[in-house]
């Protein structure tokens, strides 16, 4: 089978109005993909930027996949959360990006968004925190239901990904 190695890190995030940020991440693939090593999801530590608005996580990603075809190419999805001084967490943004299909090192910037909700939910978010969240996580990367949401732009998640492709020519998989 053809193999894909995804090695890199979630560098951090910038452009969020909230501070004390952390990120929950995961990777979604099609049915023809098999994870040989690594973990499909994880969470970074909380970082509060001291200078500027960049929260640094330097969270490693190391995944090894085998595949029979290109359909269902891996997509990384993110949930960025902020934590207040009482330890309460509220959603700062959702985002996703496709893993690049060409080998080499890639710098990625993944824009995020969050659902707005009704004016009452927006008012409650401003005063007591919280706010609307997605019921189904796959809405982040599947566009079928996403177009109906009213959203607000969030910040950007920054990644550095190295991609290695192996045996694609031997098994007739063309990139």
Curated annotation (Swiss-Prot):
One of the Pfam families matching this protein, by short name: B9-C2
Chain segments annotated as transmembrane: none
Compartments, as annotated in UniProt: Cytoplasm, Cytoskeleton, Cilium basal body; Cytoplasm, Cytoskeleton, Cilium axoneme; Nucleus
Keywords on record: Cell projection, Ciliopathy, Cilium, Cilium biogenesis/degradation, Cytoplasm, Cytoskeleton, Disease variant, Joubert syndrome, Meckel syndrome, Nucleus
GO annotation, cellular component aspect: centrosome; ciliary basal body; cytosol; membrane; MKS complex; nucleus
GO molecular function, one term: gamma-tubulin binding
Domain C2 B9-type residue range list: 2-118
GO biological process, one term: cilium assembly
Reported impact of residue 101 to R: In MKS10; loss-of-function; could not rescue in vitro dosage-dependent ciliary defects; fails to interact with MKS1 although it retains its ability to interact with B9D1
Domain of life: Eukaryota
PANTHER family: B9 DOMAIN-CONTAINING, B9 DOMAIN-CONTAINING PROTEIN 2
Quaternary assembly: Part of the tectonic-like complex (also named B9 complex). Interacts with TUBG1.
Disease field: Meckel syndrome 10: A disorder characterized by a combination of renal cysts and variably associated features including developmental anomalies of the central nervous system (typically encephalocele), hepatic ductal dysplasia and cysts, and polydactyly. Joubert syndrome 34: A form of Joubert syndrome, a disorder presenting with cerebellar ataxia, oculomotor apraxia, hypotonia, neonatal breathing abnormalities and psychomotor delay. Neuroradiologically, it is characterized by cerebellar vermian hypoplasia/aplasia, thickened and reoriented superior cerebellar peduncles, and an abnormally large interpeduncular fossa, giving the appearance of a molar tooth on transaxial slices (molar tooth sign). Additional variable features include retinal dystrophy, renal disease, liver fibrosis, and polydactyly. JBTS34 inheritance is autosomal recessive.
Family named by the database record: Belongs to the B9D family.
Role description: Component of the tectonic-like complex, a complex localized at the transition zone of primary cilia and acting as a barrier that prevents diffusion of transmembrane proteins between the cilia and plasma membranes.
Name of this chain's protein: B9 domain-containing protein 2
Species of provenance: Homo sapiens
Top-level taxonomy: Eukaryota, Metazoa, Chordata, Craniata, Vertebrata
GN (gene name): B9D2
């Amino acid at each position: 089978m053809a193999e894909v190695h995804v090695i890199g890190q979630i560098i951090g995030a910038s452009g969020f109005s909230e501070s004390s940020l952390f990120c929950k991440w995961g990777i979604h693939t099609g049915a023809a993909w098999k994870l040989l090593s690594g973990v499909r999801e994880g969470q970074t530590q909380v970082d509060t930027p001291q200078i500027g608005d960049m929260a640094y996580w330097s969270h490693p990603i190391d995944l090894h996949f085998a595949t029979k075809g290109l359909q269902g190419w891996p997509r990384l999805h993110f949930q960025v959360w902020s934590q207040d001084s009482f330890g309460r967490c509220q959603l700062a943004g959702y985002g996703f990006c496709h893993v690049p299909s060409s080998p080499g090192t890639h710098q990625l910037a993944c824009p995020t968004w969050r659902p707005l909700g009704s004016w009452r939910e927006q008012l409650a978010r401003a005063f007591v925190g919280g706010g609307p969240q997605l019921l189904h996580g796959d809405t982040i990367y599947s566009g079928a239901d996403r177009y109906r949401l009213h959203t607000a732009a969030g910040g950007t998640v920054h990644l550095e990904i190295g991609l290695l492709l192996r045996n694609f020519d031997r098994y007739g998989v063309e990139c």
